[in-house]
From Swiss-Prot:
Pfam short name (any one): Response_reg
Function recorded in the entry: Member of the two-component regulatory system FilI/FilRs, which is involved in the regulation of methanogenesis.
Name this polypeptide is given: Probable methanogenesis regulatory protein FilR2
InterPro entries, per database record: CheY-like_superfamily, Sig_transdc_resp-reg_receiver, TCS_response_regulator
Organism: Methanothrix harundinacea (strain 6Ac)
Domain spans labelled Response regulatory: 18-142
Length: 155
């Protein structure tokens, strides 16, 4: 499992399932990564600590030649660029918009919830996270993603 950005790696199509975790709180990020270890997750987690770094990472991968993450776990309260703006830019990009985004936040604000869903977030989980909620959400989205990208078999 990768706990940071390996900016020199060029990823191939057969690379593992990659999750981009955008979380500025070290303790929260470690808990999330430990939860994935408990789930037996065999993919990679790329952990970035602010919204600007996330947008830079996505722009680099958006241009082609590098595999896009298959899921983004996104905090809303981030330094440099907030999570709402990151979500908005992901969903406005033709190449990025299909990436499922799960908001992980301490915010219970109706305004944050409305803004996230108006920007087409796939799921909205409130911290502290239940291991079961995180597991269910990630498994459902992973199944959707893999099913959506699967080519139809021979007729």
């Amino acid at each position: 499992m990768s706990y940071g950005l390996d900016s020199g790696d060029v990823l191939e199509a057969e690379d593992p399932f990659i999750i981009l975790l955008v979380e500025d709180n070290n303790a929260h990020a470690m808990l999330i990564m430990r939860a994935f270890e408990r789930l037996g997750f065999t993919g990679r987690i790329e952990w970035l600590r602010d919204g600007k770094a996330a947008l830079d990472y996505l722009r680099l991968h958006e241009g082609g030649g590098r595999s896009l993450p298959r899921m983004v776990l996104l905090d809303l309260r981030l330094p440099k660029v907030d999570g709402h703006e990151v979500l908005s830019q992901i969903k406005r990009s033709e190449r990025l918009r299909a990436i499922p985004v799960v908001v992980l936040t301490t915010s219970t604000s109706d305004d944050d919830l409305r803004r996230a869903y108006s920007n087409h977030v796939n799921s909205y989980l409130i911290k502290p996270l239940s291991f079961e909620d995180l597991k269910r959400t990630v498994e459902e989205i992973k199944e959707y993603w893999l099913g959506w990208n699967r080519s139809p078999g021979p007729a």
